[in-house]
Amino acid sequence: MDGVTVIGHPLVQHKLTIMRKKETSTAGFRRLLKEISTLLCYEVTRDLELTTERIETPLEETDAPVLEGKKLVFASILRAGNGLLEGMLELVPSARVAHIGVYRDHETLQAVEYFFKAPDNINERLVIVVDPMLATGNSSIAAVEKLKERGARNIRFLCLLAAPEGIRNFQGVHPDVPIFTASIDSHLNELGYIVPGLGDAGDRMYGTK
């Protein structure tokens, strides 16, 4: 599927399977989410541009590769997106963080915005939007729209699971934003949940219903 990268690394797929199991505990789900987010972050950042810096090792001076340009921004779609941040920030501790509050109205399935806060100079940074699920796509579409309104131009979207319906909706509005996911699942059910999915990621992460 054009514009979509499925991260099929064996460790990602193994951990995702355990997360899908209904008997996986809240603590186990949270731990696995942190682990898998680190692996996903590795993949979504694999083509970052590098420059060289003159350094001194214990043996001699040498030119060594370092990241070029402004620091990354990880933009979390609240609340479930926060579960991906911990592992990603361990991998890239210098990254800035944005928080975007949108929730899905369970009757209309539309996204309602209630919070937005992002770093300055977002137009000069690569922004990686994170949310465990790309279901209807409404929340993700709204979050990316808010980022673009603030000047963001280089955006990627990272999720654990995506539904074909959500991908179509998202790409219909934001064809310029590549999607990275661990799995494209079968479909959405009548309640807008991804099937087979893993349930509500936020509820499973925080032990709520």
Swiss-Prot record:
Q: Is Transferase among the key words of this record?
A: yes
What cofactor is needed?
Mg(2+)
What is the similarity comment for this entry? Answer: Belongs to the UPRTase family.
Annotated residues that bind 5-phospho-alpha-D-ribose 1-diphosphate are located at R79, R104, D131, P132, M133, L134, A135, T136, G137, N138, S139, D200
Control of this protein's activity is summarized as: Allosterically activated by GTP.
Which InterPro entries does the annotation name?
Answer: PRibTrfase_dom, PRTase-like, Upp_B, UPRTase/APRTase, Ura_phspho_trans
- The protein's name in its UniProt record: Uracil phosphoribosyltransferase
Task: Write out the catalysed reaction.
Answer: UMP + diphosphate = 5-phospho-alpha-D-ribose 1-diphosphate + uracil
Q: Which GO terms describe its molecular function?
A: GTP binding; magnesium ion binding; uracil phosphoribosyltransferase activity
Q: Which SUPFAM superfamilies match?
A: PRTase-like
**Chain positions recorded as uracil binding sites:** I194, G199, D200, A201
Name the source organism.
Sinorhizobium medicae (strain WSM419)
Q: How is the cofactor bound?
A: Binds 1 Mg(2+) ion per subunit. The magnesium is bound as Mg-PRPP.
User: What is the recorded function of this protein according to its Swiss-Prot or TrEMBL entry?
Assistant: Catalyzes the conversion of uracil and 5-phospho-alpha-D-ribose 1-diphosphate (PRPP) to UMP and diphosphate.
**EC number of this enzyme:** 2.4.2.9
Question: What pathway is this protein said to act in by its record?
Answer: Pyrimidine metabolism; UMP biosynthesis via salvage pathway; UMP from uracil: step 1/1
Which cystines does this chain contain? none
Q: Which GO terms describe its biological process?
A: UMP salvage; uracil salvage
Enzyme class per UniProt: transferase
Q: Which keywords does this chain's UniProt record carry?
A: Allosteric enzyme, Glycosyltransferase, GTP-binding, Magnesium, Nucleotide-binding, Transferase
